[in-house]
Amino acid sequence: MCEDSGADMITVHGRTRDKIYAGEVNYAEVERVKYAVHIPVIANGGIFCREDAENLMERTGADGVMVARGAMYSPWIFAEITGGPQPDRRALVLKQLDDTLALFGERFALVFMRKMAAFYTKGKRNSSALREQLFMCDSVEKLREMIEAAEF
């Protein structure tokens, strides 16, 4: 239907709406779409690292992947997936802080970047204690110091 209507590409999420973020990606359904059309199919669902992207493409025959939540935890995932040079993660987070501050002001930047820094440090050494400190942080200056000292 999409292809017949002129679509140049289709993106398919491997979970139904009722599954939201839980459960396994339905590789068979993505693969079924891939082989039912003659246009590129981009697969989405459960991509948090390069291996996830490769697995999704291998198991479905998809032409590419779309990253969603995985990019919230790891905005550097795109360089990882493509094999490109890895960015300086700390510098990237500090730039995001500066950009958010410039666009939205101190209050929003503080709340937003505490949340984002917590995402970025998940699973790292001492990340639980760091997240507690992040959420108690009450100034952009202190937040900047914490980001400069954190492991990403």
What is the predicted role of each segment?
Residues 1-9, 21, 28, 32-43, ...:
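Alpha/beta catalytic cores of nucleotide-metabolism and tRNA/nucleoside-modifying enzymes
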Residues 11-15:
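Short beta-strands and strand-loop turn motifs
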Residues 16-23:
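Short, small-residue-enriched loops and turns at beta-alpha junctions
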